[in-house]
Amino acid sequence: AIKLNIPWSDLGSWKEILLMFNKNKRKYFKKKNIFYRPWGSYTNLYNGNNFLIKELNVKPKGILSLQKHFHRSEHWVVIQGKPKITLNKKFFTRQPYETIFIPKGAIHRIQNPNKKTVKIMEAQLGSILKETDIVRYKDIYGRAN
């Protein structure tokens, strides 16, 4: 049980509290936080002031676009798998719990050459954190600009 150190009158009634909780719960669960792409999926976990936390799941043989962003940088932490990462014409392979920083304007891509899903936590930082802030140079799914 939770013990509150404030008088009941400061809380209002249980009915009002439950109505507020249910209203917010419905509002939250109406949002579609999981987005499916040809390469796998991503989940928006937390959206703050000028930052967004995502979980990327790149399916086996999945390849994201070779892309850049004008208004944000990204910091990736590999959670599962061994992705091949392109960053400004250099190639890296990362192990679980290793990181890589993608500066604003850098051309980058994630590839999963493996037989198991790659999972990456992505922190986006910037003034515009929308999917429209993207220039695609190469994309095996036909989405290049």
Question: What is each PLM-predicted segment?
Answer:
Residues 131-145:
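Acidic/histidine-enriched, glycine/proline-rich intrinsically disordered or flexible terminal extensions
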Residues 1-101, 108, 113, 129, ...:
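Left-handed beta-helix
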Residues 94-99, 125, 141-145:
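Noncatalytic linker/hinge segments flanking ATPase motor cores
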Residues 5, 124, 138:
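Residues at the C-termini of beta-strands that transition into short coil/loop
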Residues 121-130:
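C-terminal structural segments of small proteins and small subunits
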